[in-house]
């Protein structure tokens, strides 16, 4: 719940001044001993705290998930395993789990999604990382178009989807092996491109390092690169860009943000 929501509820009598005081006293974080829940993050950044599930002891994960759900009415976890899902589900039956992206979440019903992000992959093997990006962006309120298996070994596949890609406020390009997809897309669109190298590939791909270096050294303009397999990071920053688009230029934001003729 945001500060304004608390004040509105005090104004309308939904909660008392004493209850509001308790809420503000636990700002800006809640101490659990093993974790400090950042209850002010949405106020500062516009997005609530997200749980990185991998490596967390079982009971810690369950407690963190419950507290963030109680705080925000929804919660997102990344890099979760099926066994962790079963544990969280015992305490929070409405939680859902996606076996492809390894995302664990409880999401508010009736959420309005705006703008558009295009998520593209070079190959089918890149889809788990792409889905982490796509589902993160959807959770944070963006419309997402998935355009999968359009890598450079069959460039005609990408060109057949170019209209949809060019309509997006931001493009996420997910690729392993040599990682060329991001450069190709960067040369075809006027939108920002978030490049995500994946660990997909044979020996000399070095678990994604080859793709990472290709993307960092791209000749195409307008490309930013996140870490290897970091779909969550790509989905997050793409949503920030997408919000700028629909905030300033209508549904997709293209008239003001990306239509250069508007600046003449």
Regions found by a protein language model. Give the residues of each.
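Glycine-rich oxoanion-binding loops at beta->alpha junctions
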Residues: 103-105, 143-164, 209-210, 226
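Glycine-rich phosphate-binding loop
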Residues: 160-198
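C-terminal binding/interaction regions
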Residues: 121, 163-166, 200, 204-264
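Short glycine-rich or small-residue beta-strand-to-loop segments that form or flank ligand, phosphate
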Residues: 50-51, 116-122, 171-173, 225-227
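Glycine-rich phosphate/diphosphate-binding loop of Rossmann-like nucleotide-binding domains
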Residues: 114-156
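Short glycine/serine/threonine-rich phosphate/pyrophosphate-binding segments
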Residues: 61, 126-131, 155-156, 175-184, ...
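Long amphipathic alpha-helical segments
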Residues: 1-81, 85-86, 90-91, 95
């Amino acid at each position: 719940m945001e500060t304004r929501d608390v004040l509105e509820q005090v104004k309308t009598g939904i909660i008392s001044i004493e209850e509001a005081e308790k809420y503000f006293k636990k700002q800006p974080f809640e101490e659990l001993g093993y974790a400090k829940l950042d209850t002010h993050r949405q106020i500062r950044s516009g997005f609530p705290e997200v749980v990185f599930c991998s490596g967390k002891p079982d009971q810690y994960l369950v407690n963190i998930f419950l507290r963030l759900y109680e705080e925000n009415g929804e919660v997102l976890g990344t890099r979760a395993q099926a066994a962790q899902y079963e544990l969280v589900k015992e305490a929070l039956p409405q939680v859902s789990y996606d076996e492809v992206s390894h995302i664990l979440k409880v999401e508010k019903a009736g959420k309005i999604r705006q703008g558009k992000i295009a998520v593209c992959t070079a190959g089918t093997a890149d889809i788990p990382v792409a889905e982490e990006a796509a589902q993160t962006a959807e959770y944070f309120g963006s419309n997402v178009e998935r355009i999968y298996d359009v890598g450079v070994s069959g460039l005609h596949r990408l060109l057949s989807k170019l209209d949809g890609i060019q309509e997006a406020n931001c493009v996420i390009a997910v690729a392993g092996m040599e990682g060329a997809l991001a450069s190709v897309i960067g040369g075809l669109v006027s939108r920002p491109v978030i490049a995500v190298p994946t660990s997909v590939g044979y020996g000399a791909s070095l678990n994604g390092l080859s793709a990472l270096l290709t993307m960092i050294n791209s000749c195409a303009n307008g490309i930013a690169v996140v870490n290897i397999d970091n779909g969550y990071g790509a989905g997050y920053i793409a949503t920030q860009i997408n919000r700028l688009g629909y905030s300033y230029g209508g549904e997709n934001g293209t008239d003001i943000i990306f239509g250069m003729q508007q600046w003449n």
